[in-house]
UniProtKB/Swiss-Prot annotation:
HAMAP family xref list: DXP_reductoisom
Protein name per Swiss-Prot or TrEMBL: 1-deoxy-D-xylulose 5-phosphate reductoisomerase
Protein family: Belongs to the DXR family.
Lineage: Bacteria, Pseudomonadati, Pseudomonadota, Betaproteobacteria, Burkholderiales
Species for this entry: Burkholderia ambifaria (strain MC40-6)
Gene: dxr
Record bears the keyword Manganese: yes
Recorded metabolic or biological pathway in which this protein acts: Isoprenoid biosynthesis; isopentenyl diphosphate biosynthesis via DXP pathway; isopentenyl diphosphate from 1-deoxy-D-xylulose 5-phosphate: step 1/6
Length: 398
């Protein structure tokens, strides 16, 4: 039976990879809705190729631009805009599968709507779980939704875990691998001078700018630890992080009998996306087979928390619980945006997040409104801290 997809965040890197897999299997997958924020021209190209019933953008001006181009090309795709439209296409009867690939807190509401509608959810928006893990997982369970992780690490763990939840007691711990990003071996004293372009040059993966910076600070790995806690139900002290520069082993599961299962593959997001799209079957993802003889060597090391303070902050937020993870995520989003706009330096990202966590009293949220209030408060505090921060040094040009 053909799956009907709503793809949230279709113009990003996950969206590109998803549509590449979809295009390879038109008999298996069709597109009900595509969404983008402001990249209207790319969305038009996607709509003309995949003919969704609905396209959603962030604002009225972008919607008018997209609609004009689609009508001129003879497309009948309906164009909507705004947060409610994202929610509507996520819970619509027109789709059975929602690929949640919007970056950041903006992806929470539509992902939660998909869970409450009992959809099959391919989750790439880790912020949904970082901000409101208990609320989100309760919605998945209460409404019979199916959650399939798309992040390469969590998809790897999913593949290495037993399908029968009654057998999960045999798991000792899970191990998330991390490349270490572009600054794994860089002299720590020089990190203050890192530029946005340098931070966005990931050694192994092709990703968007925000997640590339998160990888460079290793905040991304910290968020993934929190995500793994909620998806797989393990406490933080049974989730390890291991630096693996080659990005060939995507994660591991250690069992009580001494066995360790690992999932390997070339670093290409089409592999976990294809796995989640077709699960429990397997389909061609367009990815080359892994040649271990050519790679020859795999290396590992423990993370350096001094070099990567954002990772330590994320682990601390998970341990503290309450609204700490939501505040961590919100402050990080504001700080990364400021760094990409060259308003703060690279090391100020961690300093900003730390300052927000120290300034914001932790508390247990009573519901989604409390989580969103904490998110807004953390963003306000982060913006205030950044406004008072000294300007970063200007790069010399020759």
């Amino acid at each position: 039976m053909q799956k009907r997809l709503t793809l949230l965040g279709s113009t990003g890197s996950i969206g590109d990879s998803t549509l590449d897999v979809v295009a390879r299997h038109p008999e298996r997958f069709s597109v009900y809705a595509l969404t983008a924020h402001r990249n209207g021209d790319k969305l038009v190209e996607q709509c003309l190729r995949f003919a969704p019933e609905v396209a959603v953008v962030g604002d009225a001006n972008t919607a008018a631009h997209v609609e004009a181009k689609l009508r001129a090309a003879g497309s009948k795709t309906i164009v909507l805009y705004g947060p409610q439209a994202l929610v509507d296409v996520s819970k619509s009867d027109g789709c059975d599968t929602v690929v949640a690939a919007i970056v950041g807190a903006a992806g929470l509401a539509p992902s939660l709507a998909a869970a409450r509608a009992g959809k099959r959810i391919l989750l790439a928006n880790k912020e949904s779980l970082v901000m409101s893990g208990a609320i989100f997982m309760d919605a998945v369970r209460d409404h019979g939704a199916i959650l399939l992780p798309v992040d390469s690490e969590h998809n790897a763990i999913f593949q290495c875990m037993p399908r029968d939840e009654n057998e999960h007691g045999g798991i000792s711990k899970i191990i998330l691998t991390a490349s270490g990003g572009p600054f794994r071996t860089r002299e720590p004293a020089t990190l203050a001078d890192v530029t946005p372009d340098e931070a966005c040059k990931h050694p192994n993966w092709v990703m968007g700018r925000k997640i590339s910076v998160d990888s460079a600070t290793m905040m991304n790995k910290g968020l993934e630890v929190i995500e793994a806690h909620w998806i797989f139900g393990l406490p933080g002290d049974r989730i390890d992080v291991l630096i693996h520069p080659q990005s060939v082993i995507h994660s591991l599961v250690s069992y009580r009998d001494g066995s360790v299962l690992a999932q390997l593959g070339n670093p290409d997001m089409r592999t976990p996306i294809a796995h989640a799209l077709a699960f429990p079957e397997r389909v061609d993802a367009g990815v080359d087979q892994l040649d271990l003889a050519q790679i020859a060597q795999l290396s590992f090391e423990k993370p350096d928390y001094t070099r990567f303070p954002c990772l330590a902050l994320a682990l601390k937020a998970l341990e503290e619980g309450g609204i700490a993870s939501a505040a961590l995520n919100a402050a990080n989003e504001i700080a990364v945006e400021a760094f990409l706009e060259r308003r703060i330096g690279f090391m100020a990202i961690a300093a900003t997040v730390d300052a927000v966590l120290n300034a914001l009293p932790n508390r247990s949220p009573n519901g989604l409104d409390d989580v969103l209030a904490a998110d807004a408060e953390a963003r306000r505090l982060a913006a205030e801290i950044i406004a008072k921060a000294p300007a970063p040094r200007v790069e010399r040009t020759v």
